[in-house]
Amino acid sequence: VLVRQPDTSRPASLPSGPLEPRHRTLEAGLRTWVEEQTGYDLGYVEQLYSFGDANRHASARAQPGRMLSIGYLALVHESKPRRMEASEWRSWYDFFPWEDWRDGEPEILSSVRDGIAGWIAEAPRDERKSREERSRVAFGLPGSPWNEELVLERYELLYEIGLVPEAHRDGAACWAPREAAIMDADSLQADHRRILAT
């Protein structure tokens, strides 16, 4: 995954920018922003997902209106870009270590499941069964297999519980305290990790 981090005191971000009048289409805007920010010319581009939820992150709550984010998958040639300052290639698993089953079940999954178990245990009686089912399906808890296609659902569940730092940064109402957030995974600015999960 190509990320940008011009300011090392802040989390990295995906290449991005607003649609502007100079962009004839959404794809033209995407190509312009990626080339300007990373030096790469994009090859094949496919739109994957659109996010338009109200109040998705702190900066969206501070401004009137709604922010629309569109996630793309784009391919680039392996050659060196014209410039790459503040950009680097990172493993997708840096952002989702609980998804890395290449060497068997990831160690981090036990602490994730402990956090989820606490969230379920403290649920009001009428919500407990729903939380159990959602967690069982998303995280392959006893009685359910691990489904590698549920990356977004797992991330959104961890966000809702408060087990990822972005939930606390965004001021989301969540069950887990800030100290319980999983710090063994790298976060991204705004809702970029959610977009990456698609």
Residue ranges and their predicted role:
Residues 1-40, 44, 48-56:
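Conserved Nudix-box catalytic region and its N-terminal flanking loop in Nudix hydrolases
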Residues 9-17, 76-198:
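Nudix hydrolase/Nudix homology domain
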Residues 34, 55-83, 150:
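Active-site-adjacent beta-strand/loop module that shapes the phosphate/pyrophosphate-binding cleft
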